[in-house]
C-alpha cells in the first residue's frame, strides 16, 4: 500500500526526515525520489548538507545489496536517474575494501562476480588479484583486522597463491589483531616453517591464546636459546612469560638474559605472584627447592639471593625492583626477622661494592636516609676493598 502513495505525498513525508540521504538508500523504491529533491527547499537543504555522502557508498556501507544491484541495473540501462557521478559513482576498489571492513560477504561476492563478468575473464582467481590490484593483500588484511572469518576464507580461496613475504605479513596481521579463529584456519594450510615465526610474533604482541595454540601444536620454545621468552619479557607480557616457563620442566639460562633480570621484571608485575612462584619452582630446580612452595615470592628471592648473584652484576638501574624490595624490608623489619632483613640488605651492599656499583650504593644510602648502621657497614666493607673509597659519599 505504501508504494501506491503519490509522489507529492512522499516528497512531503521525506521533508520531515532528519537525514533524507539515509532514507533514500535503504530501499530501491526511494531511489526514484532523488532527482526530485531539488524541488523541495527543505529536502534540498538537508541533502546539500550531506552532499559528501555518496548514495552508492552509503548503500554499500549499510549492506543494502538490493539497492546496489538496482543502481547497477539502472547504469546498464543508462537511466537518467543515476547519471550524476557525484551521487552514484564511486571507485570499485574502495567499495570492495568497505565491504571487507564491514563484513558484507554477499556484497563482496556480488562486486567480485560483476567485476569478472564486466571484464570478460574466466579466471576469477586472477581477476581478484590483478583487477582489484590486491598486490599488497589490502582487502585480506582489512577483513582480518575486523575479525571477519567468513570473508577471510572466501578471499583467501580466490587468491591462487601467496608468496613467502605475503604469508609472513598475513600471519603478522592475524596475530597482531588476536584473531584466533582465523589463525586456526591459516595454520591448517601454513607450512611448519612458519610455526616458530608465528610464536615470536605472538610473544611480541602478548597473544596468549595463540601462544598456547602454537605450543600445543609443537612450536619449540627452546629455539634460538629461548628467544621467544626474551621477546615476551622485553615487551612486558608477563602472562605469556609465565605460561611459556610453566611448560618447561627445566630451563638452561640463556646467555643474553639472566634470572636476576627475570626476577626484577616479575617483581614489578603485581598480579598472580603465586603463579610466578610456581613457575620459578618448575623452571629452575637448581635454584628453587620444593620446600619453597609455602613461601612468598619475596621469601623465594631471599632464599636464592646467593644463587641468583652468581656470575651476575646487580645494580640499581637495571634491578631497581629487587633492591627496593630489600630496602623496604629493612625499613619495615620486625623483631622476629630483624636479623634476616639486615643480613639480606648487607648481602646486597657487599655484592654491589665488590662490583664497584657506586651509583647503586648512593641509591641505597639515599633511600635509607643515611641510616647509621648502613653507613657504618659500608665503611667497614670499604676497608676490606682497598679500591673502594667511601669519601665520595660524604
Curated annotation (Swiss-Prot):
Highest taxon above the source species: Viruses
Keywords: ANK repeat, Repeat
A Pfam match: Ank_2
SMART domains: ANK
ANK-type repeats, residues: 51-80, 91-120, 135-164, 166-193, 194-223, 225-253
PANTHER family, sorted: ANKYRIN REPEAT PROTEIN, GH09064P
Protein name: Putative ankyrin repeat protein L109
Source organism: Acanthamoeba polyphaga mimivirus (APMV)
Amino acid at each position: 500500500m505504501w508504494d501506491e502513495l503519490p509522489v507529492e505525498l512522499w516528497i512531503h513525508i521525506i521533508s520531515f526526515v532528519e537525514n533524507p540521504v539515509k532514507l533514500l538508500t535503504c530501499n530501491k523504491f526511494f531511489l526514484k525520489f532523488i532527482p526530485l529533491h531539488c524541488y523541495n527547499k527543505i529536502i534540498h537543504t538537508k541533502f546539500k548538507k550531506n552532499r559528501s555522502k555518496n548514495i552508492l557508498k552509503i548503500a554499500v556501507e549499510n549492506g543494502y545489496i538490493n539497492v546496489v544491484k538496482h543502481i547497477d541495473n539502472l547504469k546498464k540501462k543508462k537511466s537518467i536517474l543515476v547519471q550524476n557521478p557525484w551521487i552514484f559513482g564511486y571507485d570499485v576498489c574502495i567499495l570492495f575494501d568497505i565491504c571487507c571492513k564491514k563484513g558484507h560477504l554477499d556484497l563482496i561476492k556480488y562486486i567480485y562476480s560483476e567485476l569478472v563478468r564486466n571484464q570478460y575473464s574466466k579466471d576469477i582467481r586472477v581477476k581478484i588479484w590483478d583487477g582489484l590490484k590486491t598486490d599488497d593483500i589490502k582487502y585480506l588484511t582489512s577483513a582480518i583486522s575486523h575479525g571477519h572469518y567468513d570473508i577471510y576464507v572466501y578471499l583467501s580461496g580466490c587468491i591462487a597463491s601467496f608468496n613467502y613475504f605475503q604469508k609472513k605479513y598475513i600471519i603478522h596481521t592475524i596475530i597482531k589483531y588476536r584473531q584466533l579463529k582465523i589463525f586456526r584456519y591459516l595454520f591448517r594450510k601454513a607450512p611448519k616453517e612458519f610455526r616458530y615465526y608465528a610464536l615470536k610474533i605472538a610473544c611480541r604482541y602478548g597473544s596468549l591464546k595463540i601462544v598456547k595454540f602454537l605450543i600445543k601444536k609443537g612450536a619449540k620454545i627452546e629455539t634460538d636459546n629461548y628467544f621467544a621468552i626474551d621477546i615476551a619479557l622485553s615487551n612486558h607480557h608477563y602472562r605469556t612469560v609465565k605460561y611459556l616457563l610453566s611448560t618447561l620442566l627445566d630451563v638452561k639460562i640463556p646467555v643474553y638474559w639472566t634470572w636476576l633480570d627475570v626476577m626484577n621484571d616479575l617483581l614489578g608485575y603485581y598480579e598472580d605472584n603465586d603463579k610466578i612462584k610456581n613457575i620459578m619452582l618448575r623452571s629452575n630446580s637448581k635454584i628453587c627447592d620444593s620446600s619453597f612452595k609455602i613461601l612468598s615470592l619475596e621469601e623465594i628471592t631471599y632464599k636464592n639471593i646467593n644463587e641468583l648473584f652468581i656470575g651476575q652484576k646487580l645494580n640499581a638501574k637495571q634491578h631497581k625492583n629487587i633492591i627496593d624490595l630489600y630496602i623496604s624490608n629493612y625499613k619495615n623489619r620486625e623483631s622476629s626477622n630483624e636479623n634476616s632483613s639486615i643480613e639480606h640488605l648487607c648481602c646486597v651492599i657487599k655484592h654491589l661494592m665488590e662490583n664497584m656499583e657506586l651509583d647503586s650504593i648512593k641509591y641505597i644510602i639515599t633511600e635509607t636516609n643515611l641510616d647509621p648502621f648502613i653507613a657504618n657497614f659500608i665503611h667497614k666493607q670499604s676497608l676490606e676493598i682497598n679500591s673502594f673509597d667511601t669519601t665520595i659519599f660524604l
